[in-house]
Amino acid sequence: MRVSQTYGLVLYNRNYREDDKLVKIFTETEGKRMFFVKHASKSKFNAVLQPLTIAHFILKINDNGLSYIDDYKEVLAFQEINSDLFKLSYASYITSLADVAISDNVADAQLFIFLKKTLELIEDGLDYEILTNIFEVQLLERFGVALNFHDCVFCHRAGLPFDFSHKYSGLLCPNHYYKDERRNHLDPNMLHLINRFQSIQFDDLQTISVKPEMKLKIRQFLDMIYDEYVGIHLKSKKFIDDLSSWGSIMKSD
């Protein structure tokens, strides 16, 4: 085994034998790994075994089996997220999305930092629905999906009232609408936002203000994109879909 010091985000844990746990952690430098924690309920690591906990870990890495946690410090527990069902549901979804986007034991520091920053912004109170949309758009390439939301697939002009074409897997400008009789007839303003989401840097993001009607259009479009081009169906996504139907009863103004 080798020793590695790295930041990590706990994805989930599950019971193993009587009092042990298997804990999956997405680390910045070692990728996603499964860790064995003996006597977890009595372990000094119990505080950092919960999902959506970030810490600086000292790890014993086994490339051919289970790894071990040696120590930890600098714990970030996302108290605001964990105290709000809606924030927690969306945070759990993007975490699950990151989990399925890459293989185990493969380092992806860029994705780790992106996920960590997204969670921090949700914790800070920025719009969790739009942050989730941005995460979904920028994660598409991890699934091998390269869609251009910037310019027309035929003439490459930008800044026009575009529509999306499944036939050409891209945007059509008004001069080329005729190329696809089954184009989606989408709101061009929504596609403009999707284009911005594709390239936005979180360091530049101070506030988010998107009307509910536009949020719904974005949600429906991204659901369509993920269904057709990615094809994954996560339990955490179904849960946030259900929130839209019954969650308003619980949501405070």
UniProtKB/Swiss-Prot annotation:
UniProt name for this protein: DNA repair protein RecO
Protein's UniProt keywords contain Zinc: no
Species: Streptococcus agalactiae serotype Ia (strain ATCC 27591 / A909 / CDC SS700)
InterPro entries on file: ARFGAP/RecO, DNA_rep/recomb_RecO_N, NA-bd_OB-fold, RecO, RecO_C
GO CC list: bacterial nucleoid
Keywords: DNA damage, DNA recombination, DNA repair
Listed transmembrane segments: none
Gene name in the database record: recO
Function as written in the Swiss-Prot or TrEMBL entry: Involved in DNA repair and RecF pathway recombination.
NCBIfam families named among the record's database cross-references: reco (TIGR00613)
Gene Ontology terms describing biological process: DNA recombination; double-strand break repair
Domain of life: Bacteria
Matching PANTHER family: DNA REPAIR PROTEIN RECO
UniProt keyword Aminoacyl-tRNA synthetase, yes or no: no
